[in-house]
Amino acid sequence: MNTWLNLKDNVIIVTGGASGIGLAIVDELLSQGAHVQMIDIHGGDRHHNGDNYHFWSTDISSATEVQQTIDAIIQRWSRIDGLVNNAGVNFPRLLVDEKAPAGRYELNEAAFEKMVNINQKGVFFMSQAVARQMVKQRAGVIVNVSSESGLEGSEGQSCYAATKAALNSFTRSWSKELGKYGIRVVGVAPGILEKTGLRTPEYEEALAWTRNITVEQLREGYTKNAIPIGRAGKLSEVADFVCYLLSARASYITGVTTNIAGGKTRG
């Protein structure tokens, strides 16, 4: 067990923890001895329920489901030490697509609402339900997983970028509201990462189309041309920093969203 962050026995909720960044965060928290409460639609197959891990099948876009899950966690543990708002969806779309048949890659209401419901409303529902308990405790940490897109915008991802920009605003505003209760609110904005399991061929095809390049050019440009450090980030690099923010070692950090982008995004 790795104990340098002193997260042993902390009760920490991670949304979207079945794959990608979320799974990397879950793995690191478990290595630190935390009691991880993983919220997702699907549980994945790496971890199974036990003393230090519990999977909750919850639709975070439903305020009712979220409250029921948080109530159950509080009933079991009597406290919540940390929340990582990681769950999110992204459907690359252009505002106007005059080239694809029938506007295949044009932003539509269904895609717009799905991204807003998960990425924005889901974070609101989770944070409010958890913050009510943290206010009673006079302690806690909320980490919002944003994106470089939320800091600088992104071609073909306007709605996704807008939802992530909203998270950055949540982080700034909630830190001011909750600081007096001993609650910190912080964010991370990952850049281009190694394949996460969420970047499907369909996703890459759509994103490449919105930028008028090939999938091969997309991959080449991402890793070699756009990042000063010369490589994509590792999931573990994001997870390590998130766990640091959850720990008392970061006790004077609140209200900021930190880039983890290899120098690609500045601001």
Swiss-Prot record:
Pathway terms, separated by semicolons: Carbohydrate metabolism; D-sorbitol degradation; D-fructose 6-phosphate from D-sorbitol 6-phosphate: step 1/1
Superkingdom assignment: Bacteria
Example GO biological process: fatty acid biosynthetic process
Classification via PROSITE patterns: ADH_SHORT
InterPro entries for this protein: NAD(P)-bd_dom_sf (IPR036291), Sc_DH/Rdtase_CS (IPR020904), SDR_fam (IPR002347)
Catalytic activity: D-sorbitol 6-phosphate + NAD(+) = beta-D-fructose 6-phosphate + NADH + H(+)
Top-level class of the enzyme under EC nomenclature: oxidoreductase
Keyword NAD set for record: yes
Family annotation (Gene3D superfamilies): NAD(P)-binding Rossmann-like Domain (3.40.50.720)
Record-level Gene Ontology MF annotations: quinone binding; sorbitol-6-phosphate 2-dehydrogenase activity
Binding locations of NAD(+): 9-38
Keyword annotations: NAD, Oxidoreductase
UniProt EC number: 1.1.1.140
Active site, per annotation: 160 (proton acceptor)
Similarity annotation: Belongs to the short-chain dehydrogenases/reductases (SDR) family.
Assembly and oligomerization: Homotetramer.
Protein name listed in UniProt: Sorbitol-6-phosphate 2-dehydrogenase
Species this chain originates from: Klebsiella pneumoniae
